[in-house]
Regions:
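A general structural motif
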Residues: 1-3, 40, 63, 123, ...
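Mg2+-dependent phosphoryl-transfer enzymes with acidic/Ser/Thr/Gly-rich catalytic loops
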Residues: 2, 26, 167, 174-243
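Asp-based phosphoryl-transfer active-site loop
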Residues: 2-22, 45, 204
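Active-site flanking residues adjacent to catalytic metal/cofactor-binding acidic residues
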Residues: 8, 68, 195-196
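Short amphipathic alpha-helical segments
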Residues: 19-20, 55-59, 79-80, 139, ...
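Active-site phosphate-binding/coordination module
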Residues: 24-118
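A structural signal for isolated positions on well-ordered beta-strands in alpha/beta enzyme cores
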Residues: 42-44, 125, 192, 211
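Conserved acidic, metal-coordinating active-site core of Asp-based
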Residues: 106-206
């Protein structure tokens, strides 16, 4: 297995419970990240986290760039690029529009609740939690005149239920990976993706090889699954690339 770029989910994959990057065998993960840096392999976080969170993560771990808010925000050094899909409005962020135009009221009426405190500082997607049929909720949004946004399932919460993003239609992790590959001229075959949820498997067609870490949702049927959980699983894949 070879690759010049490794896309990696953050929560539940790169970091363990509580956002702990040293969960499990922390030195092993740090060693693998250092090995990738020395070998010129770019490790790129792809996450639902906000722009500020991803910028700080990249700075702390020495990562070259990152993809925030489920593919909507691309960061590289001081450069920030917004990829907002079907969002049609100027002069405001998608989240500002969601809050101002009653979009949030539609989804809250379907049994979801804000996933606080994690909405602070968000620009493109709004975090919700609960358990719904996301396609049905997205259809309700379209019927209410808000077809520019949709509900996206981003995985299972430790305490039960799912976390969802209210996001511009046409965005998502897979779209973020495609945009990053195109921007940097990276061939599909030269990439690997590591994640733990269905939203990560959605990226499989856009990379050369896709892996789930050992703690990934058990109902996900996928042949490439690491033995280790969280960062140990990430290190397992990176070590194969470095061998």
């Amino acid at each position: 297995m070879t690759a010049s770029t490794v896309y990696v989910d953050v929560d539940g994959t790169l970091v363990g419970p509580g956002g702990d990057v040293l969960a499990g065998d922390g030195p092993r993960l740090i060693g693998a990240l250092l090995g990738c840096r020395a070998a010129g392999i770019a490790v790129v976080p792809v996450t639902g986290r906000s722009r500020i969170q991803v910028r700080e993560l990249c700075r702390l771990l020495g990562l070259p760039r990152g993809i925030a808010e489920l593919g909507c925000i691309h960061l590289e050094g001081r450069e920030v690029r917004y990829e907002l899909g079907a969002f049609p409005f100027l002069g405001e962020t998608p989240v500002e529009r969601m809050l101002r135009d009653g979009v949030l009221d539609v989804v809250l009426a379907q049994g979801l609740e804000p996933h606080e405190p994690w909405n602070e500082g968000r620009e493109a997607t709004y975090l919700l939690r609960g358990k719904v049929d996301e396609a049905a909720v997205s259809a309700r949004l379209a019927a209410a005149g808000h077809s520019w946004c949709e509900v996206v399932d981003n995985g299972v919460l430790r305490r039960g239920g799912h976390v969802y993003h209210l996001a511009p239609t046409g965005t998502g992790k897979a779209h973020g990976v495609r945009v990053d590959r195109r921007h940097h001229g990276i061939a599909r075959a030269d990439t690997v993706y590591i994640g733990d949820a269905a939203s990560d498997l959605a990226c499989a067609d856009d990379v050369g090889e896709c892996w789930l870490v050992g703690n990934a949702e058990p109902e996900l049927d996928w042949p490439n699954r690491t033995t280790g959980a969280h960062g140990d699983g990430v290190a397992e894949v990176l070590e194969q690339l470095l061998a």
